[in-house]
Amino acid sequence: TLGYIECLIDYLTDLRDADVNEITKDVWKIEKLDIQVKQDLIRPRKTISFTGISQPELKEEIKKAVYFQLRIESLETVKKELTAIRRFSRYLNEHKKNVKSCADFDRTIIEEYLVYMKTEDTGTKRYRSEITRLRSILNIVADIYQYPQAKDLILNRDIPPNIRSEFKVYSDAELKRFNEFLAKVDIQTARVMTIHQMLGTRISDTLTLRTDCLMEQNGEILIRIYQMKTHYYEKPISQELAALIREAIRYTEERYGKCKYIFTNENDHTKPMTYSLIQGRITTAIYRENLRDDNGKYF
């Protein structure tokens, strides 16, 4: 598309002016890149690693593709593409030692790799996602380096249909036990989990709620929820949930002053609480309180 071409031209211009020392390294420090990297605030990353790509020429091609991708995609998406290319690189190193660059790729190599992925224990449980990500980054390399022979080598028919995941459903007794358990963790962690349940959102959406998220409109209380990829949306909430959110805001402001996020990072008040912190607190408490589901397994 025209937008993609314009982005590619801008990328090549930025690449010319970039910090050459950083983008030639095998491990990039995100803070040293001269572009704004979009990433999940509750799962922050500090580096991007290209180690594990065995072929030097391929590694350099992938670096340029990643530098381009970081302009338009989230860091999490790019890291998943890197996982796919590292796995492909290992296969090439073991079975196609003469292949050094994307310029050497052809349909036969891809077909043989797809068979290998289906028949060998490659360590991935998400075949469809892996192939989709591999296609994405290989096509970008083909565009940047003008390798027409390497473009669209992975076909639509190579990618199996998406299979919907089954969500775990908790019984009323399990939910009752879990909610009783929340009374035994620290108050702000309990509020995170309760608000998360009542909103019915992803945990990342709850952890990035802002202190100005509540508003009134036509007699209703609305909450504004920010998402990394879709900016924000608003939805009505109950008086009870609004009261709980206000308590969480008051707790934060009494301890840390005015903050951007309700559940602020205690070490950096410009950022939200991290997912790993919440996960660690809840997991520790689950084992301490011996909290189990109806089948006797830990929650």
Residue map of PLM features:
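Short, charged phosphate-coordinating catalytic segments
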Residues: 145, 195-217
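Basic, alpha-helical nucleic-acid-contacting "clamp/cap" segments
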Residues: 131, 135-145, 217, 226-272, ...
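Charge-rich, intrinsically disordered N-terminal extensions
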Residues: 1-154, 181-184, 194-195
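A cross-kingdom feature marking solvent-exposed beta-strand/loop segments within repeated
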Residues: 1, 94-126, 156-165, 176-180, ...
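Short, basic/aromatic-rich helical patch in the C-terminal catalytic core of site-specific tyrosine
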Residues: 134, 206, 299
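Active-site-adjacent "gating/activation" loops or surface patches in catalytic cores
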Residues: 150-175, 256-259, 269-298
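Short helix-capping and inter-helix turn/linker motifs at the boundaries of alpha-helical repeat units
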Residues: 56-57, 104, 168-169, 182-186, ...
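Basic, Lys/Arg- and aromatic-enriched nucleic-acid-binding interface segment
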Residues: 173-203, 293-294, 298
